[in-house]
């Protein structure tokens, strides 16, 4: 007879059940409605299927749609499997690879027999997926011996699945999930059946190419993306967000507003146009003022440095593949045969600024009286990102960071963290962001330092957060770097998307590797703690975020063109030009539009480029020395004298830190 086991439920109530009882049975014993709503379970911290037998004492949480994060993970996983099944039914001979869940959906990579998939195939595949959902096939977990599964894959011509399985240890048991006749290798868990999915809550969105295992030397596959939700209402809301995101796409607005461009000859590097660079300069000037007021010392360090420094810092071993490396060469008389200098040294463009900042710290003898030392650089770095990963301003190869490093003692960590978080919060609010989430990455399994060091570091960050009123942060066990815990700050933009921008990383290792020290109060030499910190991250990416957050409608202090003086008749041209000159002299960024075009055409054109203010002048305004101010997006206008208009615009155009 089966033994009894003790199951603790989420409300801490306990039940004794027979060993081998399933979550389905336990849910049914609680209530019929719970049994119907149940999707999966978490048992002793592990996600499991409802049908998986429980073999030991443990804590059980029954997952329903109310557990939205877990439920979405489950349904998207199932949609990916159903996508693969549908494709193989419609396109016989297609080989399957893998299909993970993404932030808002799923994708699956295929090796088609005849041709790559196109967007024209998607409606047909969607229809087949709905048929599979309607069949309500049970999703059954099976355990197979590795070698038998490999033989099966090979007999079916599934070379990619077979290749993957062959790399797993011999004798290892593998799990598959079967839905009717179709199955796929998968760890699970899955919903009880395909009928648990809402057939109106998913949509296939696009296709692309992808290399097998992400290696360009491997076969090119066809990737199909989809988005999946718990119900049709969620899908509709998501598609509306996507539509809004497309309207705000920084690449489209960047072109419409003449901010920047990218081109093939400089992949991953940005050509900033005058309008875009004006935004950059305003942002940089604002940050420079804020950092100066917070007692940061700005520095400038070389972009090209010897590989020996990167070896000493540890970046060479861990980051070399992402670095642009050049030999230290001396040109020869034969242009086809460059001659290496004596040692044939390798140089590398810096991917980050921290080793260079330590070199400045090491110049001369540092005293504890100088700490904390806050060192800032708007440092240009280069990272050799894969071509396929590049994306507008959001992922580039040449990037400029608002990078700073705080050298301090262990006792100063809490105070410095508090000051940093307060500064970050103030800057985000100035830039139009009122909401952000905080995550604390904790010690990984492999780490430098002992448990006491990590206890103090992690508790110090917790204490600092709580002292500034942040109590709902998320802890991420095992996600910290090997050299220290980290805080991450994730902004929420105007349409609800999150962007990880700010970081504060404790580092006990790099100062030791690069032999940084200071003279302590007792005369001994000690290592400083190094706090790597950023607020906006990189200028390129953050400006992309700003463009999309504001939909191109920048606050006046940051707008590249703050006003256009547009004429109705040619008799007002000279007056318009005099207004522009007077406003420029006052410090405003203003241009004139005296073209022989109708005023409505001019207004429409400048509205498309998101100019915040259009100052309309006709014959009457010119005679009276006035302008009619029309705000972007408004049909109303106010009539002011030129001096009144200048005063109004100057007040609105004052950066938030100078008000």
Swiss-Prot record:
Domain of life from the UniProt record: Bacteria
Keywords: Aminoacyl-tRNA synthetase, ATP-binding, Cytoplasm, Ligase, Metal-binding, Nucleotide-binding, Protein biosynthesis, RNA-binding, tRNA-binding, Zinc
Localization (cell): Cytoplasm
Gene3D superfamilies: 3.10.20.30, 3.30.54.20, Anticodon-binding domain (3.40.50.800), Bira Bifunctional Protein, Domain 2 (3.30.930.10), Threonyl-trna Synthetase, Chain A, domain 2 (3.30.980.10)
Gene Ontology CC annotations of this record: cytoplasm
Primary localisation category: cytoplasm
Annotated region (Catalytic), positions in chain: 249-555
Cofactor(s) annotated in UniProt: Zn(2+)
EC annotation from Swiss-Prot or TrEMBL: 6.1.1.3
Its job: Catalyzes the attachment of threonine to tRNA(Thr) in a two-step reaction: L-threonine is first activated by ATP to form Thr-AMP and then transferred to the acceptor end of tRNA(Thr). Also edits incorrectly charged L-seryl-tRNA(Thr).
NCBIfam families: thrS
Family classification: Belongs to the class-II aminoacyl-tRNA synthetase family.
Protein's UniProt name: Threonine--tRNA ligase
């Amino acid at each position: 007879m089966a033994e009894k086991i003790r199951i603790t439920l989420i409300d801490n109530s306990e039940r004794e059940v027979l060993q081998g009882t399933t979550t389905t049975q336990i849910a049914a014993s609680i209530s019929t409605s719970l049994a119907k709503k149940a999707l999966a379970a978490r048992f002793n911290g592990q996600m499991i299927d409802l049908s998986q037998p429980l073999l030991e004492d443990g804590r059980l949480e029954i997952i329903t749609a109310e557990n939205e994060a877990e439920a979405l993970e489950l349904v998207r996983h199932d949609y990916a499997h159903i996508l693969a099944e549908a494709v193989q039914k419609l396109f016989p001979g297609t080989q399957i690879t893998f299909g993970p869940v993404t932030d808002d959906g799923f994708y699956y990579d295929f090796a088609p027999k005849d041709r790559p998939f196109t967007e024209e195939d998607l409606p047909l595949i969607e229809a087949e997926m709905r048929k599979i959902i309607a069949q309500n096939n049970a999703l059954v977990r099976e355990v197979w011996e590795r070698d038998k599964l490999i033989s099966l894959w090979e007999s079916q011509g599934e070379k990619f699945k077979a290749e993957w399985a062959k790399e797993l240890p011999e004798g290892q048991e593998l799990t598959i999930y079967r839905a009717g006749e179709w199955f796929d290798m998968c760890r699970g868990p899955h919903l009880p059946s395909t009928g648990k999915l809402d057939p109106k809550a998913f949509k296939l969105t696009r296709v692309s190419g992808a290399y097998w295992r992400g290696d360009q030397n491997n076969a090119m596959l066809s990737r199909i993306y989809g988005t999946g939700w718990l119900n049709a209402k969620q899908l509709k809301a998501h598609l509306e967000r996507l539509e809004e995101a497309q309207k705000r796409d920084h690449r489209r607005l960047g072109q419409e507003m003449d901010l920047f461009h990218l081109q093939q000859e400089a992949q991953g590097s940005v050509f900033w146009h005058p309008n875009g660079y004006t935004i950059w300069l305003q942002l940089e000037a604002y940050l420079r003022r804020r950092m100066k007021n917070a007692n940061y010392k700005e520095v400038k360090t070389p972009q090209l440095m010897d590989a020996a420094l990167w070896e000493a810092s540890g970046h060479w071993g861990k980051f070399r593949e992402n670095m642009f490396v050049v030999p230290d060469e001396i040109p020869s008389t034969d242009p086809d045969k460059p001659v290496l200098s004596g040692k044939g040294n390798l140089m590398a463009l810096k991917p980050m600024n921290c080793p260079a900042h330590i070199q400045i710290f090491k110049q001369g003898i540092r005293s504890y009286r100088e700490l904390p030392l806050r060192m800032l650089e708007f440092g240009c770095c280069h990272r050799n990102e894969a071509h396929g990963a590049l994306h507008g301003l959001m992922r580039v190869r040449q990037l400029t960071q608002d990078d700073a490093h705080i050298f301090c003692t262990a006792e100063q960590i809490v105070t410095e963290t508090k000051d940093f978080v307060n500064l970050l919060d103030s800057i985000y609010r100035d830039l139009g962001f009122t909401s952000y989430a905080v995550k604390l990455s904790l010690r990984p399994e492999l780490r430098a330092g002992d448990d006491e060091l990590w206890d103090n570091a992690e508790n110090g960050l917790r204490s600092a957060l709580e002292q500034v009123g942040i109590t709902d942060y998320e802890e991420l066990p095992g996600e910290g770097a090997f050299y220290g815990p980290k805080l991450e700050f994730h902004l929420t933009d105007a349409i609800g998307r999150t962007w990880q921008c700010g970081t504060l990383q404790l580092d006990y290792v790099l100062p030791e590797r690069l032999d940084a020290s200071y003279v302590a109060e007792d005369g001994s030499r000690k290592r400083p703690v190094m706090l790597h910190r950023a607020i906006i991250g990189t200028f390129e990416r953050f400006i992309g975020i700003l463009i999309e957050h504001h939909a191109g409608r920048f606050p006046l202090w940051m707008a590249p063109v703050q006003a256009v003086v547009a004429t109705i008749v040619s008799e007002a041209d000279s007056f318009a030009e005099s207004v522009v000159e007077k406003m420029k002299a006052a410090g405003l960024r203003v241009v004139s539009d005296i073209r022989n075009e109708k005023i409505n055409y001019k207004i429409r054109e400048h509205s498309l480029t998101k100019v915040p203010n259009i100052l309309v002048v006709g014959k009457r305004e010119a005679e009276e020395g006035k302008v009619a101010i029309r705000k972007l997006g408004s049909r109303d206008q106010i009539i002011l004298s030129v001096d009144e208009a200048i005063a109004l615009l100057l007040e609105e155009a004052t950066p938030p830190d100078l008000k």
